[in-house]
Amino acid sequence: MKDPIRKLDEPRSSVATKPLRRVVAALILRGEGPSREIFICQRRAGQPMGLKWEFPGGKIEPNETSEEALARELEEELAIHATIGPLITTIRHTYRNGGAIEIEFFLVRDFQGEPVNRIFQQMLWSPFSALPDYDFLSADLTLIRDLADGKLL
């Protein structure tokens, strides 16, 4: 006999429900006006979603605030000491594999040191208008459009 009819809002048993992962990311800016740029990073080829572009950041550890997590991640990934600015936006995204992520994006205008590439394939400063030219993670695509269109920052 076939399985009983399943309501559409009930999860399929074959798709594992994964816990929501909370992460933080930095929108690091330099310059002013039309010449301002934003810092972006490309994942290494061997990583999950390899060679996709993203903003630097990472997971929030237990007992850590979002701002503490972002400052720690920027030190670990880029060797910079950043002053974490205001929260710009929060995005929730569910990937095709069932993984769900909540990303808090913070503005960073002030930091000490020059970014050092500790974990990425490549890193660069991009004009806002060029952001759609890069192959970003799907969770970032709405933000990328808003930044390129001048709707944020």
Language model regions located:
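Active-site-adjacent beta-strand/loop module that shapes the phosphate/pyrophosphate-binding cleft
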Residues: 81-82, 89-114, 122-124
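Short secondary-structure boundary/capping segments
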Residues: 18, 45-46, 95-98, 114-117
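Conserved Nudix-box catalytic region and its N-terminal flanking loop in Nudix hydrolases
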Residues: 35-77
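Generic C-terminal helix-cap and adjacent flexible tail
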Residues: 148-153
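Conserved N-terminal beta-strand and adjoining loop/helix that marks the start
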Residues: 3-39, 59
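NUDIX/MutT-family hydrolases
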Residues: 107-109, 115-147
